[in-house]
Structures are given as structure tokens and as C-alpha cells.
Amino acid sequence: SNKGGLTGIPTGYRGLDDITSGWQPSDLVIIAGRPAMGKTSFALSIAKNVAVDYHIPIGFFSLEMNNVQLVNRLISNVCEISGHKILNGQLDNTEWERLDRKLRDLTGAPIYVDDTPGLSVFELRTKARRLVREKGVKLLMIDYLQLMNANGMKFGSRQEEVSTISRSLKGLAKELNIPVLALSQLSRNVENREGLEGKRPQLSDLRESGAIEQDA
């Protein structure tokens, strides 16, 4: 259904949605950054907005964190409480009440997490098809692209393998007719450039493959 005039899946971030009109069917969307710059946190915030606020089913493939770690991060995001405080139970009465209230919102939210380590792009395609067929998933999220592999194929370099993965994800988005969001690492080049403008990421900074900027 149309969400606030958007034609695609809303992110919950008005400025971004105004620019994109939501993520469109068959889109491959890349969220890129250097390590520890908040890519996963941003993706989880979007996941919360999509699944909890809009009740749109999503599939989240986490190659970096296991299921427990990811759920803890999601709870922290939804409740706006430090994950460390939640893990240690160091909450005041107001925070306990907020945790209880927000967990009720989160319980039953259509978020389907797969934390299979070392997932190949071919395994992901099989799992994604099943999620769309059985759960009605409308958005796939992958954390993160460079942790995937293309087992069963031979490549002259890692760059060629990542290019194949990127093209496969774009093909999957088109086949399933849903947006696929993949997190991606940036190369060190962005850190080696001088000045504020020099630190601004460029498409050429996408790590291990120039194909990502063409497919997304």
C-alpha cells in the first residue's frame, strides 16, 4: 500500500524517503562506510522502522553478528537504551517500563533473521526465495557484502568474486521484484585523502569491486 505518498518501501527517514520515494522493487541499495562508522546501527534502525512501524516483512542476513548479538542491538535501538545496560540489567524503573512497552511492539514484528556464517550468494538466493514465498518478505538486508562468497566458482581475484556477488544480488532483486539492501565496506583510500572534502566517500571507494557502483 502507499505509505505517505511513497511508491516504494519507506525507510522511516523523511529526508531520505523524499529523495527516493522509498526503495523501489528490483533496487539494489548499498549503504557503505568504513568499519565502526555505524552501518549496522543504521540498517537496524531502518529494519525497526519498516517492520515495527509499517509492519512490512523483512529478511535480515547477518554475516557479521550472530542472532543473539543482532537481537540485542535491535532491542537497544528500539528502546533507545544502551545495549550494555540491557545486558547487565542496569536499568532504572523508567527504563524497565520503556523496555517492557517497546518489547511488546517488537514481539511479533515480521523480522526474519538468518545468521549463517560464511553464507554464499547461492545459498542466500535459496533462502531469500523461501522467505518471499512463505513469509511475504518485501525487503532483504545483508550485513555485509564483503563477507559473502561465491563458492563453487573459480575467480582470478577477490575483486572478480565480489563483482559476481554484486551482480547476483542485483539479479536477485529483479527476480524477486523487491529491494535488496546490502552494507558494504569502503577502502582505506577515504582515510588517506586530506581535508574535509577529501574524507567524503566516493563511489570508487567501494571495497574490492568497481562493479558495486554499477549494479546499485
Regions found by a protein language model. Name each.
Residues G4-G5, G83-N93, I111-G118, N149-S163, ...:
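Flexible beta-alpha connector loops of hexameric P-loop NTPases
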